[in-house]
Amino acid sequence: MFVVDLSLSGNMRSLTHGKSIHRSSIVVVTHCSHRLSLSPLNRPALFPSHSDRYTVPWRCRPSSWRLWITFVCLLTLHMFGLSSAVKRDGEVPTANLRASLSPDSSKEDAMLLSAIGGIGPTESRLQHIPFRTTRYLPIRSHVLQSTVERIESPEALNEVPTKVERNEFTEKGDKTEQVLTAQADHKSLLEGRSESTSTAPDDDFDFLFEDDTPKKPKSRVNKGTSSDETSPGDRSSGEGSSASDSLLSVVHRTKGNATQANKNQKRITHPKSKAQHQKKVTKKQGIPGSDSLGTSSADFDFDIDSSSNTQADDSQRQSLGDSSALDLFGSDTGDTGDIFGFSNSSSDGGNAAANDGGLFSSSGMGPTGASDETSANPLGSILGGVLNPFAQQQSITPMTDKADEWSKENMKAFEEKMPKKMRDDGSPDSWYKQAVPQESVADLNRMRENRRIAEENRAAAPLSAVYTKATKTVPAINYLGAGYDHVRGNPVGDPSSMGDPGIRPPVLRFTYAQNEDGVSNDLTVLQPLGGYVRQYVACRQSETISELSNLSDYQNELSVDASLQGGDPIGLNSFSASTGYRDFAKEVSKKDTRTYMLKNYCMRYEAGVAQSNHLKWNVTLAFAAGVSQLPDVFDAHNPECACSAEQWRQDQNAEACTKTNVPIWISFIEQFGTHFLVRLFAGGKMTYQVTAKRSEVEKMRNMGIDVKTQLKMQLGGVSGGAGQGTSSKKNQSSSEYQMNVQKETLVIGGRPPGNVSDPAALAAWADTVEELPMPVKFEVQPLYHLLPVEKQEAFKQAVTFYSKAVGLTPQDLSALTGVTRNLPKQLTQATQVAWSGPPPGFAKCPAGQVVILGFAMHLNFKEPGTDNFRIISCPPGREKCDGVGTASSETDEGRIYILCGEEPINEIQQVVAESPAHAGASVLEASCPDETVVVGGFGISVRGGSDGLDSFSIESCTTGQTICTKAPTRGSEKNFLWMMCVDKQYPGLRELVNVAELGSHGNANKRAVNSDGNVDVKCPANSSIVLGYVMEAHTNMQFVRDKFLQCPENASECKMTGKGVDHGMLWLFDRHALFGWIICKTVNEPAMHVATDVGKAKGNGKKKKGKKGKNKTNAPNEVEEGQQLGADSPSQVSVPADADSGPTSKTMSSLKLAPVKLLDL
């Protein structure tokens, strides 16, 4: 049976054997019979007005005359008005449906009127969206939601393809209507409207990639609210029968699909884009300019059966010469196009039938063209000029440019997705379901890998070419990795060599490569592997002129340009063996001159290497050969060795030194230095060192002229009057005044200018700096990092020996400057500062002074454990000393003691030691560095907890020894020690004595306020205090902060009483301990035997003789002056026994000074 469904409504049910036809439809059913008859199914009249259903039976075999008869019958039915719309209740509407339709009519009426050429969507305020071709999906059950109830209809266990067609309409606030068609023998499952929204994707190709490709966001054709409405498709079953979609779907430009299927099968149809449909129409109508099958998006507009693979396509079936290709109604072996040119795909046992053109497939009047192949039906050319009576003629237009653009976009999207999809394996879930051979996959992967490698090679080729362009290095790179002698060096420059005399031969051997590691980041120059090079263009003049008052100021000025990593000083006696250092020492010793320094920098390059101990650098052949000759020990470090630094200074060829390995080490250090350069700024530097008379400086100050500004003006640095707060008259005097100064200019890098005062000459010099740069600022690292581990300790000992043997000693400075350096005097003239409070805290020196020595302690005698006890040394040369630790509880306390002076004593070195936790039973020992001995220090034993002070003890170190020890006390848990060391040849060292005392300790007595015990630390006889402190340790340290005091200088004793604080309860008392430590100086030590002492002694003696009638009782601050009275004959000197006792309490001691001989010098 062949059924043609001319549905004018979106709602109807299946038709099977001419039975049960739903409302509002005209159906022509043709049976295989011997005669043609038109008879109503439900009405007696042959042509009643607006009949519902008719059947047209005849014999099965189609032919051309049967086609003509069928077409004439259909045309006649249309002329008699049988294709009119019928309302839901079966009544015939008025003749003029267009006039009877109101804006409030149902969507079905609006769709009906639009289909037969009535008012358009704009007039009816409704929008019509054409059908789209759909795909078939296997489902097991359908859930249908009506306006009244929800019904579930389970299907058979086997998957039944079901086709759902939707029409979309949009109206204000309306819901979506969907109608599902099912088998004819089932009852209606849907009577109302389903309140659901279509979720069909608009993209024509998304369903091909649903296995792993995410869906695109839905893009509606209409703006505003959209609704979907379903139009049913008729089904028929039986051998050799074929199905056709309704003619009304043709009017709506919807592709109809008819399939040979079992009667339990259903299909689900999703809408497709209007642009896609118009593209197919244009192609079927044969409009010029349409693309071929291979380029049109219609080529991919096909349904995919999810349960089977496609076996043949239309082109293959036509090429085989299938006899059914031109059959109008199809045959038992395949599907053919219907009379209106629709191509239908059918599925039977996993086989896809071929599709052919139908009646209107090639005619210009065909409303749609859904076939993938151009129809070969001869009726297409015969009826080319016949108008389609069932469609709106205005909607049949050729493909627009916009539709063609949409088609190309769809084709482009498909081509973009196809390669991605083809990369997937041929798994059963894959969309194409093709078994790809493994060899093909391997070949494809191999080709893809070859393309990737080729692309990488093409990308890397320009980079390698860029790297090969870098062929030069920066001019000053040869200084990087060079050795440096910190004792003989001088970054400012040497007057004789006009350069830094500390630069030594290269130590590091660099490797270069033209790659990303061997070329600078700007791809201009080569750089060492593991290092870096970059341009650094900067020329600046110092904003301020530095006034150098002493050797410490000079050393600090040099350390700005040459320092260890982080800016710390290089080491002992740094730069002291250079000519510039000796000259400045002579100049600064003169009290009638003032020295100033001004620097100008012009930097061009910066270079550096990685400063890591884990990086093994390559060294030069000469350095490696020198290291191989070094022994593993340094003989002079042995106390029994007779070759000391003093012996080497006096006679290095003496037998005491030649029999040792000391010459080998000294030769190695003199050749390669003590350090090596790891970072440098290369360019030029011009240093002005100006010396002016003291009287000249005082005269300028009296005139109101700023000395530093005047020097800048004379040196060409700044304009007159800059930075001065004087009157205009004084400014005029400043501009007219010329200082009488002695100027020395040192130039490093570039071509030295002829006249350093000429700006043009200075500009020419700055231009030559880039071609001839030299290190103007650099950082160094100790050379022992490049030595084997077994030789590093010996190298450190050798460097200390070298610094003392070659550099200036205190005796040398005394002889050079004519000023006696005496350690007790220097310490006595310093300022003591004691601070207490919560940790960390800090103690600060008075203005203009820096730290000479000191310590910071963290104490807690209430909490158990030993982690609450810490001690560190205060770094010299800084303005303050920071505490140690943090306050984790209210009983954590800090104590800081520092000694401040105008300049640090570089020869003093501090040592701190702590015992491991719970090691109180072991003796703690600390040693001074090489060639140094103890000046003073103390050791303390402590224990945590409220009763820890019961085990507290303190001991002093012995002056002149190289080791200081602290023996534990009973019950102690931790020992810590602090001491200071100095060169054993330092003047006045033998005058000092250390004293430590533990006073009252035990339970605190709150009734004895400020008198709870005492501590009294006394100096030995004939000595006075140089420095020291007294302190009270308490269970609650926060309540005794005021009981931490420094001892008065020149006094004979230092004492303090307890505060009397007890916060214990019942029989639990707080503990406390009072203790102190002092350094005393003796008064019977002869003065230093130097020539200047003789002159001062005679002068002082004459001066004293002139003071007749004066009280001969000397104040404590006159003790040292009295020591130098009459060096030629014995003198009586009064020394107070206790400075606090007043002038009436004094003890006299006579001492006889040894005669001074010039031969002793």
Swiss-Prot record:
Q: Which family does it belong to?
A: Belongs to the MPEG1 family.
One cellular-component annotation, GO: symbiont-containing vacuole membrane
Give positions of region: Disordered: 154-329, 353-381, 716-736, 1094-1149
Q: Which parts of the chain span the membrane according to its record?
A: 67-86, 554-589, 694-740
SS bonds (residue pairs)? 539-602, 643-657, 845-900, 874-881, 928-981, 957-964, 1019-1080, 1047-1054
Quaternary structure, per UniProt, is: Homooligomer; forms a homooligomeric pore.
Protein's membrane topology:
Multi-pass membrane protein
Q: Where is the composition biased (Basic residues)?
A: 264-283, 1099-1111
Q: Where is the composition biased (Polar residues)?
A: 222-234, 309-322, 361-378
Supply the domain comment: The MACPF domain includes the central machinery of pore formation: acidification causes a significant structural rearrangement, leading to oligomerization and deployment of transmembrane beta-strands that enter the membrane as amphipathic beta-hairpins.
Q: Which domain of life is it from?
A: Eukaryota
Q: What protein name applies here? A: Perforin-like protein 1
Which species does this protein come from? Toxoplasma gondii (strain ATCC 50861 / VEG)
Matching InterPro entries: MACPF
